[in-house]
C-alpha cells in the first residue's frame, strides 16, 4: 500500500491526459506546471515524475499532461529500485504511446496537411478525423498508423534521464516562495525555471521529435507514384543532415522554448484568477468542481498555446524543402495570411481523443502491474 501511495489513480491519468500541449509542454511538465486545486490537492493529484510534488508557495504542484503521469521513485529507495521504476516507466510509456499512436499520427497529419499539400505530398485536404483515418488506411495500410511511433517511444528514456539531471539545479536556482517572496517574483521564477529546465531537456531530444514528426507526416506522395520521402528513422537524420545540416534537425526549436513559457504563464494566470472565484462556499471542497476546474484550466492553457505547436511543426516540415520560413514569426504570419487562424488549431480535436486513449490504456496497464507484481511501478511520461 505504501508503494501505491505515490502512484496516480485512474482519474488522475484521465485528467492528465487531457492536456492539449505536445513536446514543448513536456519541458513544462518536467517542472510541475499544474497546481492542484482545493480538494483536488488531497484526492486527485499525484507527485510528478520530476520533483515528487514540489511545493511552491504553499501550492502543491503536480503534473497534468498529454502523456501519462510518471511517479518517480522516492530517493530513499536507492538506485536499484529507481532503475526498476525507470525501466517499468519506459514499458508503460511504450504501451501508452503505442496504443495511442494511430490517433497521434492522424493528429499530426491533420495539423500539417497544408504544408504537405504545398510540397506535393498530399493530393487534397482531409475532411476530418474519420476521413484522415480512412484515407491513411486505404492508401498506406493499417500498420502505417504507427509510423513514427518508434522515435516517440525512444524519446522517453533520454527525456526522463535529462529531467532527473536538471531538476535539482533549476529547483535551487529559482526557489521562490509565494508567501515569502511575493506573487510576481514566484510567478516569474516559475516561468524562468520551467523555461530553463524545459529548454535544457528539449535541446537533447528535439531531433527525435523532429524525426517523429517527419515520419508521421510522410504520406505516400500524391504525385510521386506512392513513394515515401523517408525509409525510416536513420534515413530522416541522414537526408536532413545532407540537405540542411544540424540546423534542419532543430528547425522550430526557439518557438518550442517560447511555448514552454507561454503555457506556464497561461496556466498559472488562469489558476490564480479562477480558483478564488469558482471554488467558494459549498464548492470549496467539492471533488467534481475541483476536477472540472483543473480540467478546464489545463485544456484552456493547452488550447491557447496550441498554435505554437502548429507553427513549430510546420517549420519542421520545411527542412529539406527549397522554400522555408524565415522565422517563427514569418511562419505565423504566412499561415494566418494564406490559410486563416483556423489552420493554427488543426488537429486539436484528435489530440483530445489521443489523450483519452492513452489514459485508458495506462489505467489498464496499472492494474496488470498490480496483478502480476503486487504493486504499481512508474507510469511513463514525456
From Swiss-Prot:
Gene Ontology molecular-function annotations: ATP:ADP antiporter activity
Name by which UniProt lists this protein: ADP,ATP carrier protein, mitochondrial
UniProt keywords, alphabetically: Antiport, Membrane, Mitochondrion, Mitochondrion inner membrane, Repeat, Transit peptide, Transmembrane, Transmembrane helix, Transport
Cell location: Mitochondrion inner membrane
Superkingdom of source: Eukaryota
GO BP term (any one): mitochondrial ATP transmembrane transport
Sites where the protein binds ADP: 155, 167, 312
One Pfam entry name: Mito_carr
InterPro entries, per database record: ADT_euk_type, Mit_carrier, Mitochondrial_sb/sol_carrier, Mt_carrier_dom_sf
Domain comment as written in the entry: The transmembrane helices are not perpendicular to the plane of the membrane, but cross the membrane at an angle. At least 2 of the odd-numbered transmembrane helices exhibit a sharp kink, due to the presence of a conserved proline residue.
Upper classification of the organism: Eukaryota, Viridiplantae, Streptophyta, Embryophyta, Tracheophyta
Positions of region (Important for transport activity): 312-317
PROSITE patterns, sorted: SOLCAR
Amino acid at each position: 500500500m505504501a508503494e501505491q501511495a505515490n502512484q496516480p489513480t485512474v482519474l488522475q491519468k484521465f485528467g492528465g491526459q487531457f492536456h492539449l500541449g505536445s513536446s514543448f509542454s513536456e519541458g513544462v511538465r518536467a517542472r510541475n506546471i499544474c497546481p492542484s486545486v482545493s480538494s483536488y490537492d488531497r484526492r486527485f493529484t499525484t507527485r510528478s515524475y520530476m520533483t515528487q510534488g514540489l511545493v511552491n508557495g504553499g501550492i502543491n504542484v503536480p503534473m497534468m499532461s498529454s502523456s501519462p503521469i510518471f511517479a518517480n521513485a522516492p530517493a530513499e529507495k536507492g538506485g536499484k529500485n529507481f532503475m526498476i521504476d525507470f525501466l517499468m516507466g519506459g514499458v508503460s510509456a511504450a504501451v501508452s504511446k503505442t496504443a495511442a499512436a494511430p490517433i497521434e499520427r492522424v493528429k499530426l497529419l491533420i495539423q500539417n496537411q497544408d504544408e504537405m499539400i504545398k510540397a506535393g505530398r498530399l493530393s487534397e485536404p482531409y475532411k476530418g478525423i474519420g476521413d484522415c483515418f480512412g484515407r491513411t488506411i486505404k492508401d498506406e495500410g493499417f500498420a502505417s498508423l504507427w509510423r513514427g511511433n518508434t522515435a516517440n517511444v525512444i524519446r522517453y528514456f533520454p527525456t526522463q534521464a535529462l529531467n532527473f539531471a536538471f531538476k535539482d539545479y533549476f529547483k535551487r536556482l529559482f526557489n521562490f516562495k509565494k508567501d515569502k517572496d511575493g506573487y510576481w517574483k514566484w510567478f516569474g521564477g516559475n516561468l524562468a525555471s520551467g523555461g530553463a529546465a524545459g529548454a535544457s531537456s528539449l535541446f537533447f531530444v528535439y531531433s527525435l521529435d523532429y524525426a517523429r514528426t517527419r515520419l508521421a507526416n510522410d504520406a505516400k506522395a500524391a504525385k510521386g507514384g506512392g513513394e515515401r520521402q523517408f525509409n525510416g528513422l536513420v534515413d530522416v537524420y541522414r537526408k536532413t543532415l545532407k540537405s540542411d545540416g544540424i540546423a534542419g534537425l532543430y528547425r522550430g526549436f526557439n518557438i518550442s522554448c517560447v511555448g514552454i513559457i507561454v503555457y506556464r504563464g497561461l496556466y498559472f494566470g488562469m489558476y490564480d484568477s479562477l480558483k478564488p472565484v469558482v471554488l467558494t462556499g459549498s464548492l470549496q471542497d467539492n471533488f467534481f468542481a475541483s476536477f472540472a476546474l483543473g480540467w478546464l484550466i489545463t485544456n484552456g492553457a493547452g488550447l491557447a498555446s496550441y498554435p505554437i505547436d502548429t507553427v513549430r511543426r510546420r517549420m519542421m516540415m520545411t527542412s529539406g524543402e527549397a522554400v522555408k520560413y524565415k522565422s517563427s514569426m514569418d511562419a505565423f504570419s504566412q499561415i494566418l495570411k494564406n490559410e486563416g487562424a483556423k489552420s493554427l488549431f488543426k488537429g486539436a480535436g484528435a489530440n483530445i481523443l489521443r489523450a483519452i486513449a492513452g489514459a485508458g490504456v495506462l489505467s489498464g496497464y496499472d492494474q496488470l502491474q498490480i496483478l502480476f507484481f503486487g504493486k504499481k511501478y512508474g507510469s511513463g511520461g514525456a
